[in-house]
């Protein structure tokens, strides 16, 4: 089967999420904003304490914090942090003694997240421009890695999970919500950059997704379905035909695993 042109994909994803940053009230394949966050399980009282601009740009596919179980003083990395809602939410959970680093490769998203977090006085949050396949962070520097609706956008998911293992301390948690499929996607979908950017074309089969996590040095503690629906008819049709859906995954880095890759 043919594969997606990575350069075209990267350009399309950056274009899509630049628009999300600049026009959060625009029309997209996916739902956004506070109503989505509350339906997925976010605490309304804590949402009230977050920057409104970050909440209105939220485009996640699940509630990772029920799995992450963050506690005061922990170090967290958010892969694909967007405009920063999850990173800011995590900052309130880990407190002033903790630290949250958000990673995103869209410059407009990073700039917006920095402005919003600074205005909210969240000094324990930092946003770095970078790729989730090459996380700009040192080895074994985090207690938990979170990600929400982003890994499906990567053309190299095994590398993402290897990088997550690298930055986690032994016994650290990987708590993610993402898009997977029950059946293989046809070639025309896999090669469609628009459908990748809409969080459909890059959906891995669920069993392949789980195997990639395990191969990176994690023990999968559980996988759960999320209540999530697409907006556009084209996206809904693909979802219905191939079983494209949102799931949440909790995995724990093996105590003996040190991950692979570089240190920064």
Where are these predicted regions, by residue range?
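A short glycine-rich, Lys/Arg-flanked "PGG" loop and its adjoining helix->strand segment in the class I
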Residues: 158-173
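Short, glycine-/aromatic-enriched active-site segment of Class I SAM-dependent methyltransferases
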Residues: 180-200
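Conserved alpha-helix/loop element of class I SAM-dependent methyltransferases that forms part
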Residues: 30-75, 86-93
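Conserved SAM/SAH-binding beta-strand->alpha-helix loop
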Residues: 106-108
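Conserved SAM-binding strand-loop segment of SAM-dependent methyltransferases
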Residues: 120-133
């Amino acid at each position: 089967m043919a594969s997606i042109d990575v350069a075209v994909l990267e350009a399309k994803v950056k274009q899509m999420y630049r628009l999300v940053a600049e026009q959060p009230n625009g029309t997209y394949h996916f739902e956004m904003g506070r109503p989505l966050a509350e339906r997925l399980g976010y605490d309304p009282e804590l949402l009230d304490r977050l920057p409104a601009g970050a909440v209105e740009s939220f485009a996640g596919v699940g509630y990772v914090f029920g799995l992450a179980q963050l506690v005061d003083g922990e170090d967290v990395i958010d892969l694909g942090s967007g405009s920063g809602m999850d990173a800011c939410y995590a900052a309130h959970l880990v407190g002033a003694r903790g630290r949250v680093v958000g990673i995103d490769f869209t410059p407009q998203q990073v700039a917006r997240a920095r402005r919003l977090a600074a205005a909210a006085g969240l000094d324990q949050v930092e946003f770095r421009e970078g790729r989730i396949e090459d996380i700009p962070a040192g080895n074994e520097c985090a207690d938990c890695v979170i990600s929400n609706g982003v890994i499906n956008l990567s053309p190299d998911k095994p590398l993402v999970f290897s990088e997550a293992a690298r930055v986690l301390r032994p016994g650290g948690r990987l708590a993610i919500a993402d898009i997977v499929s029950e059946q293989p996607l046809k070639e025309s979908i896999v090669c469609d950059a628009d459908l990748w950017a809409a969080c459909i074309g890059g959906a891995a089969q669920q069993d392949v997704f789980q195997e990639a996590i395990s191969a990176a040095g994690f023990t999968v503690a559980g996988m759960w379905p999320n209540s999530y629906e697409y907006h556009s008819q084209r996206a809904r049709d693909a979802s219905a035909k191939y079983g494209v859906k949102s799931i949440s995954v909790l995995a724990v880095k093996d105590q003996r695993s040190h991950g692979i890759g570089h240190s920064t």
